[in-house]
Amino acid sequence: MPIEIVCKIKFAEEDAKPKEKEAGDEQSLLGAVAPGAAPRDLATFASTSTLHGLGRACGPGPHGLRRTLWALALLTSLAAFLYQAAGLARGYLTRPHLVAMDPAAPAPVAGFPAVTLCNINRFRHSALSDADIFHLANLTGLPPKDRDGHRAAGLRYPEPDMVDILNRTGHQLADMLKSCNFSGHHCSASNFSVVYTRYGKCYTFNADPRSSLPSRAGGMGSGLEIMLDIQQEEYLPIWRETNETSFEAGIRVQIHSQEEPPYIHQLGFGVSPGFQTFVSCQEQRLTYLPQPWGNCRAESELREPELQGYSAYSVSACRLRCEKEAVLQRCHCRMVHMPGNETICPPNIYIECADHTLDSLGGGPEGPCFCPTPCNLTRYGKEISMVRIPNRGSARYLARKYNRNETYIRENFLVLDVFFEALTSEAMEQRAAYGLSALLGDLGGQMGLFIGASILTLLEILDYIYEVSWDRLKRVWRRPKTPLRTSTGGISTLGLQELKEQSPCPSRGRVEGGGVSSLLPNHHHPHGPPGGLFEDFAC
């Protein structure tokens, strides 16, 4: 029967001390190589932190009233800083801006703006044919009758051409323009370009941006001065009211840049007959801020469809393009004044579909035709004044000159004088009132005032948090190792087979039966080499 003998081996104290010393030296060496391997505690960190008051509130030392007061002071200062920081952040997120005005130095030459004018009456009564009256009945309110005064119910007219009707029946500038001068030089109807608006056939002076006329001086006599006959005898009689019925007499005028199409039915101003109207202009160059400070449209954000038919983006061009898309989608045609090559709407579609579509469109931020302002814009500020004309002497003179009576002169003649107040332009620029650099500066001032901190202090706190977190993760990831032997003090318990395998000495006998004489206590054999090493076997 096999016998298992368990022995206890006790090493001499002289053998253990050098090993402990060696292990201690190795541990000291590792500690010198990798200092701070274990994270610092909060008290140690607080005593070395540059955050004011943290060392006195959380540092090493006894807990007492003094430390409590310091902790309250630290928390109060921290709360005050957070309150101020929240207010600064809210102010920054509102994106405030201011407007700076910089008057420019006088220039020797200034580009004269484009001047668009329209007679308020769209169709001349004498120029309307029977077919025109028939097709325009819904627009003009005139009853469709033939030349004998009978209703033209059974007549068949050719399909109307709205462009031809407007071009043929609109007021002709050659008949209205009685005199024209620009900067002391004579001008004529040939210096005007035909343009179509909601008022029909209109005319624009100085329309071409490639050959813009210059103005070399400010004040009256250095701009455009024209005398017009509005031809009130050609105004349509009112039989019934329609959307196109007008009770006014005079012209509509808009002063704009050459890159901007006229939007005269909303942006124009009226000029009455019997008056000389003075319009003093001031060029204004406006610069708006894009998102998030404003809502202007930058040139880099423009898309090709938004510029279709125009050389540059403008609010007027955007509105006209949007209105055309709406009318085209609902009425399957476009109005004469809209850009594009699509089919022109006939007169009956004007009143039945197109006008209602335009009336339903809104231009507000929530409307389908909201057009943001371009970030760079040139506009012209206006100051308007007027005097009554003609006086008694000039009324008789003009009546003889144009073969009219004085009453006709007073009711139909007007003078328009457009000029620069001075050859200077105003630069108005939106600027961010509170930017990121100002926010950081204010936050730094509040941090220094309340808690005495800086960016480096925040880095210290983040570094300590990282150090503690990393140590916790290492402890979680570390797996415990199962030891091969269980040691208590200097005593180890081994089985006989382990003793045979781990002993550096060869076996001297067999463990069978009673053959155990070779396993004797150490003092029964000759002592080992000198040096104080003793091995005691307890079996």
UniProtKB/Swiss-Prot annotation:
How would you summarize where this protein is expressed among tissues? Expressed in pituitary gland. Weakly expressed in brain, vestibular system and organ of Corti.
Which Cys-Cys disulphide bridges does the record give? C118-C202, C180-C187, C296-C375, C318-C371, C322-C369, C331-C353, C333-C345
- Keyword Transmembrane helix applies: yes
Residues of the region (Disordered) are 501-531
Q: Give the residue interval(s) assigned to the motif GAS motif.
A: 452-454
Q: Any ranges marked Cytoplasmic in the topology annotation, and which? A: 1-68, 460-539
Name this polypeptide is given: Acid-sensing ion channel 4
Q: What is the lineage of its organism?
A: Eukaryota, Metazoa, Chordata, Craniata, Vertebrata
